[in-house]
Amino acid sequence: MCIRDRLKHNEMLPRILSCTALILDIIILAVFFVSSRINADVDSMAYTDVTGINNKLAYQNHIIRLNNADDTFLVGVIMFDLNNLKRVNDTLGHEMGDRYIESFSAILAGVQNERISAYRIGGDEFCVILEKTNAVEIHQILDSLERKINVYNEKNNIKISYAKGYEISTREHYYLMEELTKRADSRMYENKRLMKGKRLDGRRLNV
């Protein structure tokens, strides 16, 4: 190699090293981005039910977080239990039963915002946890949910029916999460007993 070639080589070397470093930085950023997306997707799958709503693990984590908070003041819990699921499964098959659950899940998911989270915590059991809430807001949510269910039922042969019950932790009636969920659950089952015997209409679930 002649002196001129060596000089050119020496001049090019820093540029080559700079480009190599830039390429490595881009590769590292790309790997980090992909890894972050994969981790986010894994987390989402871990806390999402097959119906697309938050699952029981997400619910349990929310309960733990509220238990570890300074207080549960103005936390509300609404419990739901679908009626007639066994009848749908027995008469129309489990696929229709799954669609019955999915239809309710999709409607219930619509109540969510930064303070309100909806969960499927059992086969036909659902829960909504509200923070910084009050009885007026809960009744508004329940009324809105009922209107949406009524619209759905007008368009579909199998009618969604559900029992509900709620409780709020207030200054006058302060509850920790275990007692709060128990009281909401108890009111839901009281509502379910009142609705017992209600018959399933239609023969087909259209979604």
Where are each of the predicted segments found?
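A short linear hydrophobic-aromatic micro-motif
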Residues: 114-118
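Short, small-residue-biased leader/transition segments that mark boundaries at the very start
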Residues: 1-3
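Catalytic-core segments of nucleotide cyclases and related cyclic-nucleotide turnover enzymes
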Residues: 139-146, 150-154, 168-200, 205
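PAS and PAS-like sensory/regulatory domains
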Residues: 158-163
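Conserved long alpha-helical elements within nucleotide-processing catalytic cores of c-di-GMP signaling
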Residues: 43-46, 54-76, 83-109, 119-123, ...
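Short beta-strand-to-loop capping motifs
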Residues: 128-133, 168-170
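Cofactor-binding loops of NAD(P)H-dependent oxidoreductases
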Residues: 80, 167
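Signal-transducing coiled-coil linker helices
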Residues: 9-49, 57-67
